[in-house]
Regions:
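Conserved phosphate- and dinucleotide-binding cores of soluble alpha/beta proteins
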Residues: 1-169
């Protein structure tokens, strides 16, 4: 599961889904996962770290006992271990900056040269998950820049590691 606004939007969408008793095996726990744990949709979340808004962090700290047994923090060597990801049959969800028509994904650099963020564990999950999904808005900069391009300006995830790309257009 990736980090960011799009990932939290997908997690929010799971709140109204027919899916129940889900488990999250991820690198980072975000606001949306706490909401799913509260609602009982998610039974457990295993991760290496938190990436929470100040409000969600304060809420977690004030109700930590309610999350006992539902949140497991593990070393990165375990949470991102390729064999564990593969054995668990994870459905990986990561964000992207751009993807090309061949399925190559750029997760780190804007316009091919300005670093936006690091690759994190997305490579571990993309390559080893049962299903590797990348989610993104179809455009950036008020619709002036397409996230789906003829050829990615930089490639972090090769075509063979990417199975599904989803935008709000489909």
């Amino acid at each position: 599961h990736g980090v960011g606004n799009v990932a939290n939007a997908v997690l929010a969408g799971l709140m109204d889904s027919p899916f129940e008793r889900m488990a999250a095996y991820t690198e980072v726990i975000q606001d949306g996962m706490l909401d799913l744990l509260d609602a009982g949709k998610l039974t457990v979340a295993s991760a290496t770290a938190f990436s929470l808004s100040p409000e969600a962090a304060a809420d977690l700290n004030s109700r930590m006992s309610q999350f006992q047994g539902k949140i497991i923090l593990r070393p990165q060597e375990i949470s991102n271990h390729p064999e564990l990801i593969r054995r668990l049959g994870c459905i990986a969800m990561n964000g992207l900056i751009e993807a090309d028509i061949y399925g190559a994904v750029n997760s780190t650099q804007v316009m091919g040269s300005r670093i936006q963020n690091g690759i994190g564990g997305s490579g571990d999950f993309a390559r080893n998950a049962f299903i590797s999904c990348f989610v993104t808005p179809s455009t950036a900069k008020d619709g002036r820049i397409s996230a789906i391009v003829p050829m990615a300006s930089h490639v972090d995830h090769i075509t063979q590691d990417v199975q599904v790309i989803v935008t709000e257009q489909g």
